[in-house]
A protein has these predicted regions:
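Solvent-exposed, charged helical/coil patches
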Residues: 1-37, 105-106, 111-122
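Conserved catalytic cores of phosphodiester-cleaving nucleases, focusing on short active-site segments
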Residues: 15, 38, 58-76, 87
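A short acidic/basic microdomain associated with nuclease active sites
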Residues: 34-50
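Short beta-strand or tight-loop elements
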Residues: 42, 56, 103
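Basic/aromatic recognition patch in beta-strand/loop cores that engages polyanionic ligands
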Residues: 48, 54-58
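Short solvent-exposed loop/turn micro-motifs enriched in small/polar/acidic residues
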Residues: 52-53, 80
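Nucleic-acid nuclease catalytic cores
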Residues: 71-117, 122
Length: 122
């Protein structure tokens, strides 16, 4: 996908060792340059029986449909994948990408489709 290609371009240009925020800013620039609609640090509200019980902040949301969670660690661990799935459960987004700007860049794609997604009752 275009997002994954852009991720690898940023990896190749910057290399390993920067803070996540540096990679996030570079990725935002490149995704915008490719004509994608992007927002960063979007608040995701978590609801329990219609009541807001907490908030998450997504690193990047692309075209209001894809949540992109960024890491700059040695490798992806299960807790990162669970975090992404929770973001998907709390939004209308069905696709999530976990991008790790580690020594060896890696990504995971997750899809979460469930009619019982945890959202505020309308």
């Amino acid at each position: 996908s275009l997002i994954i290609k852009t991720f690898y371009e940023v990896c190749n240009e910057l290399g390993y060792g920067f803070l996540k925020k540096v990679y996030q800013n570079a990725l935002l620039i490149e995704l915008k340059n490719r004509g994608l609609q992007v927002s960063s640090n979007e608040k995701i509200k978590v609801y329990y029986k219609g009541e807001n019980v907490g908030d998450y902040y997504a690193d990047i949301i692309v075209n209001n449909t894809i949540i992109v969670e960024l890491k700059a660690t040695e490798f992806i661990v299960e807790a990162f994948e669970n975090q992404l799935l929770n973001y998907l459960r709390g939004t209308d987004c069905k696709v999530g990408l976990l991008l790790n700007f580690g020594k060896k860049p890696e990504f995971k794609r997750r899809v979460f489709e469930n009619k019982r997604k945890i959202r505020k009752n309308h």
